[in-house]
Regions:
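Short, well-ordered secondary-structure micro-motifs
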Residues: 43, 142, 218, 250, ...
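C-terminal substrate-binding subdomain of Rossmann-fold SDR/epimerase-dehydratase oxidoreductases
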Residues: 4, 17, 30, 59-62, ...
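Residue-level signature of the cytosolic catalytic core of signaling kinases
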Residues: 41, 50, 216-220, 278, ...
Length: 377
């Protein structure tokens, strides 16, 4: 495979995948396809924009005719599909946008790929459609051990000081879908379409479901960059409910490595879970962020705990996500490489060192959105 489209490549996870592929595979032609919505930012890729094997194309994935023409013109061999609306709060306010982009956009890509690849003499040989999804499609897990227990698995990236599970259950590749938000419902639907194109037409597809990502270049509507910025400026930290909800955290560069491995070596028609083996309650993550930001800014560590502000909980807020990546670990040899404390330190330092990037994003419409989300809670 030489001609690869990466959709959503100007976004958070997508930009890390684009950078990895452009730098690692100079013999590939990498096309970054992105609509450049509020979360798409070409500044994320300034360091590679002049590379000879990189091209950016501004396009809406729902534009079937334009994407089909691109498939023909560039003779596309592989698609890594990351483009999606992904913020749960926004999906609650505007589910139609999520259905359009995540469901119809994915269907548009699938149909264009099908028509182009089936027109070739070799048809699907050497082709691949890789769809990146979320663990939220599985629903929620129970919090049977709110104080934490020893988890059944460990990796070199597991936290040195905080290695706990908050229940015996985990999401597996065989877990039944049970989405609870418009966002997760739209992603579940897109997952089903991808699998249906394999089962019906024989398209070589792969689906992966990942846990919460963190790292550089994440749009500050998500917890970690939002709170790093607020702590820096000593603005209130709006914590849903009591902050007891649990998420599994995966450093974005580890996720990009997994995508690379699965794209090249994963089995067609398989599903792989990609997790960080790091369960944390939201309130505990926030305390780690406060301590880290305070220390790196030369403040007394923990002195900004007083800006934690508990607000009305999110509608349908799932209690716990925890993902089991054992299949990926055993079959392809992947596991996260960065210990959580190291990843958080690296992440916080990046945002503090790149305030101009943050300022450019948090001006204008962002302030209006932020007030709508949190001002009256």
């Amino acid at each position: 495979m030489k001609n690869i489209v990466i959709t959503g490549g100007a976004g958070f996870i997508g930009s890390h995948v684009v950078r990895l592929f452009v730098n690692k595979y100079p013999e590939y032609n990498i096309i970054n396809l992105d609509k450049l919505t509020y979360a798409g930012n070409l500044a994320n890729l300034k360091d590679i924009e002049g590379k000879p094997n990189y091209k950016f194309v501004k396009m809406d994935i729902c534009d079937f005719e334009a994407f089909y023409a691109l498939m023909q013109k560039e003779q596309i061999d592989g698609i890594i599909h990351l483009a999606a609306e992904s913020h749960v709060d926004r999906s609650i306010k505007d589910p139609f946008t999520f259905a359009r982009t995540n469901v119809m956009g994915t269907l548009s890509l699938l149909q264009a790929a099908k028509l182009y690849w089936e027109s070739l003499p070799e048809k699907y040989e050497g082709k691949r459609f890789y769809h990146i999804s979320t663990d939220e499609v599985y629903g929620a897990l129970s919090m049977t051990h709110p104080e934490g227990i020893e988890p059944p698995f460990t990796t070199k990236a597991s936290s040195s000081s905080h290695h706990e599970a908050y229940g015996e259950d985990f999401f597996y590749e065989t877990t039944k879908y049970n989405p609870h938000s418009p966002y997760s419902a739209s992603k579940a639907s897109s997952d089903h379409f991808v699998r249906a194109f394999h089962d019906t037409y024989g398209m070589p597809t792969i689906v992966t479901n990942c846990s919460n990502n963190y790292g550089p270049y994440q749009f500050p509507e998500k917890l970690i960059p939002l709170f790093i910025n607020n702590i820096r400026h000593r603005k209130p930290l709006p914590v849903y409910g009591k902050g007891e909800n649990v998420r599994d955290w995966l450093f974005v560069e580890d996720h990009a490595r997994a995508i690379d491995l699965i794209f090249h070596e994963g089995k067609v028609a398989e599903t792989y879970n990609i997790g960080g083996f790091n369960e944390w309650k939201n309130i505990d993550i926030i305390k780690v962020l406060i301590n880290t930001v305070d220390r790196l800014l030369g403040r007394k560590e923990g002195e900004d705990m007083n800006i934690i502000t508990f607000v009305t909980d999110r509608l349908g807020h799932d209690a716990r996500y925890a993902i089991d990546s054992t299949k990926l670990q055993k079959e392809l040899g992947w596991e996260p490489s960065l210990q959580f404390e190291e990843g958080i330190e690296k992440t916080v330092k990046w945002y503090l060192d790149n305030q101009e990037w943050m300022d450019n994003i948090t001006s204008g419409d962002y302030e209006k959105y932020y007030d709508e989300m949190y001002k009256d809670r």
